Each structure stands twice: as C-alpha cells, then as structure tokens.
A protein has these predicted regions:
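Short beta-strand/loop segments at the ligand-binding rim of alpha/beta enzyme cores
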Residues: 1-4, 60-64
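The substrate-binding groove and active-site-proximal loops of carbohydrate-active enzymes
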Residues: 3-13, 33-44, 96-116
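Catalytic domains of carbohydrate-active enzymes, especially glycoside hydrolases
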Residues: 11-42, 124-127
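Surface-exposed amphipathic alpha-helices with a cationic face
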Residues: 26, 50-60
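Extracytoplasmic/secreted cell-surface and envelope-processing proteins
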Residues: 42-47, 73-75
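Active-site-adjacent "subsite" loops/lids of carbohydrate-active enzymes
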Residues: 53, 65-125
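Charge-patterned, long linear interaction tracts outside catalytic cores
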Residues: 127-133
Length: 133
C-alpha cells in the first residue's frame, strides 16, 4: 500500500512562491516534498532553506532534503563548486586512468564536504529525512 506520494521541488529562493506551490501539491494528494538542494543553494540560499521546510510542515507536508548534483557524484546538471575548488579529488577511470568530472567518494576531502553539507542541512532545516538522488 502506498502511504506517501512525493514531488521533487527545485528553486529555494522564494518561500512565498513555494507556499502556493505546496498548497497546489496538497490539493493533488501529495504528502511529501523532496527539496532538491544544490551546492549553490547551500552556499547562497542556505538561510532560506529552513523557512521552506517550516512552510511545508505548516501545510502538512513531510520534507526530504535531496543533495542534488552534489560533487556531480549524485545526479543533476548543476555545477559543482567542490569540484572547481578540488580538482585533485575527482574520480579516475579504472579502464583509462582518465580523470572524470565527478567527485571521488573515496577521498576524505569529499566525504568531509558531503557530511558537512548533509549534517548542516539536517541541523538547520530539520527535514523529516534525506533522499539520495
């Protein structure tokens, strides 16, 4: 039995606009919103993210945070600031030795970065959980 219906939501700069979107989601039977948070959102819009979570909760929606496009390791077309600042921490092809345009989860640098990203959002925004995209 399906107990939750979810929609992904991207664009964390205007909570008033999101409120209207969240109300429309509810009117269509959605019970959970997945907030796609990019590295840019984390660096630039982070102060807004708790307000989005609070607004969704106020309207009766559960909230999952999705670290979308983070390090290009997780899906998404977004630019990775981590990769721009840490080119030595990219994945390397086992077949060709070529450096790939994705963060390498085997490096402590990326693990620390990703852990900080997730724990900071969990602590500050208080979502109901995380969604790995």
């Amino acid at each position: 039995m399906i107990t939750q219906t979810s929609i992904s939501y991207y664009g964390l700069n205007n909570v008033e606009h999101a409120e209207a979107d969240f109300k429309e989601m509810k009117s269509h039977g959605v019970t959970q919103v997945i907030l796609a948070v990019t590295e840019f959102d984390f660096d630039f819009w982070r102060p807004n993210i708790p307000a989005f979570v609070d607004k969704a909760h106020e309207l009766g929606l559960r909230v999952l945070i999705d670290p979308w496009g983070n390090g290009k390791y997780f899906g998404g077309e977004q630019v990775s600031k981590f990769l721009q600042d840490n080119v030595e921490n990219r994945q390397v092809s086992a077949l060709t030795g070529e450096k790939l345009p994705y963060a390498c989860f085997n490096t402590n640098s990326y693990r620390d970065y990703f852990k900080n990203f997730c724990t900071t959002l969990a602590r500050e925004a208080k979502p109901d959980g995380c969604f790995w995209d």
